Regions:
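Outer-membrane beta-barrel channels and translocator barrels
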Residues: 47, 58-59, 95, 178-180
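Residues on the lipid-exposed face of transmembrane beta-strands in outer-membrane beta-barrel proteins
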Residues: 52-56, 86-92, 171-177
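Ligand-site clamp/hinge motif
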Residues: 70-72
């Protein structure tokens, strides 16, 4: 943060023209520094990326198989992304004149977590804390000109949910038939299919009322 907690409080008082923060509040902020909401919003984001493959065959048949798994946490709390890919290619010389092949690709990706209102969080009341004195989530809106009536900014990423799933299938086949030494008949066909599923939930703690949504798209 550019300002200390006490400096922020004095700036709010100056802007509002009233003592939004009392002298006691400012004294406490001098000691504690206040809540740095960035420490709660942001985190280290480890990821893993694993690739495996195999290939081989014989004089008449060859194959290639591969798989990829990617997982990553978001730099914002309660967000993550994952993806899994599988690929299989097979070619076969069935006779002196006929060669066929199949290529398949399957993928699923999943994105979890709601968008966090970082701008609101950075300007929220630094004298407040994520938890109240009883250890429960601090869910009381602040109307002092600091929180602008918005709920505690960590409630949305914690209690709201959003899940976006994308499934993709790409498949193709081909056949080559040698009609003559100088003429080859090539036949191919392919299929591509994408399914999208978007679901979400908004908690009453954040929006006053609960709401759930599910949308499918192909």
């Amino acid at each position: 943060p550019v300002l200390t907690g006490a400096e922020f409080a004095r700036g709010v008082n100056l802007r509002n023209g009233v003592d939004t923060y009392s002298a006691s509040d400012i004294s406490n902020l001098e000691t504690s520094g206040g809540t740095n909401w960035q420490d709660y919003f942001f985190r280290s984001a480890p990821f893993s990326n694993i690739n495996i493959s195999a290939s081989g065959g014989s004089e008449d048949v060859d194959y290639y198989l591969s798989a990829n798994s990617y997982k990553a946490d978001g730099t914002i709390v309660d967000q993550d992304y994952s993806r899994m890919n599988l690929r299989a290619n097979i070619n076969a010389q069935l006779s002196e004149k006929l060669k066929v092949g199949v290529n398949n690709f399957i993928s699923r990706s999943q994105n979890n977590g709601v968008r966090a209102n970082i701008a609101t969080g950075m300007a929220w009341d630094i004298s407040q804390t994520p938890l109240d004195a009883s250890g429960n989530d601090n869910s009381s809106p602040v109307y002092s000109g600091v929180g602008n009536g918005t709920p505690q900014p960590l409630l949305a990423p914690k209690y709201n949910s959003r899940e976006n799933i994308s499934d993709q299938l790409i498949s193709s086949i081909y056949a080559n038939y040698e009609l003559t030494d100088n003429l080859v008949l090539n036949i191919s066909a392919g299929l591509e299919k994408i399914d999208l599923t978007n679901s979400g939930y908004v908690s009453s703690l954040v929006n006053g009322t609960s709401e759930a949504t599910v949308r499918d798209q192909q």
